[in-house]
């Protein structure tokens, strides 16, 4: 059971393109489940890095990691070809998403940009399958095995990174007492620093600036980690447009009431 489920394509995307999200909602006492859509079994140290990053930003629960391989592609078709090299199909890619929604019953699901941020095929496949999963996860005729195991379930909301409709802008630059005065974005920077193998990539300068000049999430304009669109809702559209939990009551609060 999770208030928020984030399906990150790779082991550092949760700290990069979703920078600020995990520490922000962790600081608010949310139950958060992180899922990784690819498994870096060809570079096993990244599994350790992802755990160190999650613990740094306040996540309490172990993630779920799929068995889908990680290879670069630029299209959904290309991504499907990469997972096919290990015997997986489009149906498997969709079924995994449906299973995660039914298993963890998130009130809010969060997905990658439909265009894959910088164009990565696995980001695109992840987002496309999440969209379809939200549409069918409440129907027991789809993937009946997981329907029988977990029951059917439809999230109350789906937010898609950079989606152009029903836009919200998150504030990750306000200091948090939960993190000793650091902002959620600053915590994600510390989380990304745990990904030692990725410090020589262009992602570091994208997040920090070439000379460390980026100190706020709001300074990042390309693939902004602050911008999302509400793709699906069963609890009404957002009015304040700055909080994924607008119109949502945390599971813990529901139990208290």
Question: What kind of feature is each model-predicted range?
Answer:
Residues 1-143, 257:
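Active-site beta-strand->loop->alpha-helix modules in alpha/beta enzyme cores, enriched
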């Amino acid at each position: 059971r999770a208030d928020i489920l984030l399906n990150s394509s790779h082991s550092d995307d949760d700290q990069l393109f979703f920078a600020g999200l995990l520490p922000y909602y962790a600081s608010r006492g949310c139950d958060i489940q992180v899922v990784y859509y690819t498994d870096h079994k060809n570079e096993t140290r990244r599994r350790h890095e992802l755990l160190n990053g999650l613990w740094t930003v306040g996540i309490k629960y172990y993630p779920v990691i799929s068995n889908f391989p990680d290879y670069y592609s630029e299209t959904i078709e290309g991504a499907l070809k990469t997972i096919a090299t290990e015997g997986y199909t489009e149906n498997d890619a969709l079924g995994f998403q449906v299973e995660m929604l039914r298993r963890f019953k998130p009130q809010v699901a969060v997905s990658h940009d439909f265009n894959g941020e910088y164009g990565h095929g696995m980001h695109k496949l992840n987002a496309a399958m999440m969209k379809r999963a939200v549409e069918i996860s409440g129907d027991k005729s789809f993937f009946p095995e997981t329907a029988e195991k977990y029951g059917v379930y439809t999230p109350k909301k789906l937010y898609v990174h950079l989606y152009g409709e029903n836009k919200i802008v998150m504030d990750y630059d306000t200091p948090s007492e939960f993190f000793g005065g650091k902002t959620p974005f600053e915590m994600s920077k510390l989380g990304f620093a745990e990904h030692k193998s990725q410090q020589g990539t262009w992602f570091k300068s994208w997040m920090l600036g070439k000379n460390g000049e980026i100190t706020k999430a709001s300074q990042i304009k390309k693939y902004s980690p602050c911008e999302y669109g509400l793709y699906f809702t069963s609890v009404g559209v957002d009015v304040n447009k700055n909080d994924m939990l607008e119109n949502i009551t945390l599971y813990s609060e529901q139990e208290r009431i």
